[in-house]
Amino acid sequence: DFLCTEEAVRAMFADQRDVSGDVEVLDEFGLDVLNQDTIKGYRIVFEQLHSGHPWNALENDEFLMKLRAAAKNKNGTLSPTIAGLLFFGEAYHITEIFPNYFLDYREECDDKAVRWLFRTHSNEGDWSGNIYDFFCKVRTRMDDDVAVPFANRRNGYRVDRVDVHDAL
């Protein structure tokens, strides 16, 4: 907390929005700009985490509207929201709206002669490049890289996850 001038407070009120910018409807796009495999993968994870949730029974269009990833546009048809495009869209459509959009993950080492050991980025072209798929791709890479010491539980099954997996 800090003391603001009256002018600064007026500026803050002028800048506030009643609606979050990420639910702005992108009227110029249809839902075909969203990657169906990403939506399918997200729904599988959603159902695993929220079994019995009423949204699991919804069709994709309704599900996306509940997530606020899609909404009716000025013509009354469905379009993605900014959040929906970023989360489920294809990188080449995302960069039409956000030209500087670029997700980049690198595994670097101390050897200055080696730029990186592994790299993936949203403009590779062989995957969607959206935020959700990027998260899944990087998380899987990090998860697979965790060393798991060989240990058996009392019931005879191998321990295949360690605390680091949970932290990730």
Task: Enumerate the predicted regions with their spans.
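Active-site helix-to-loop segments that bind/position phosphate- or nucleotide-bearing substrates
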Residues: 1-168
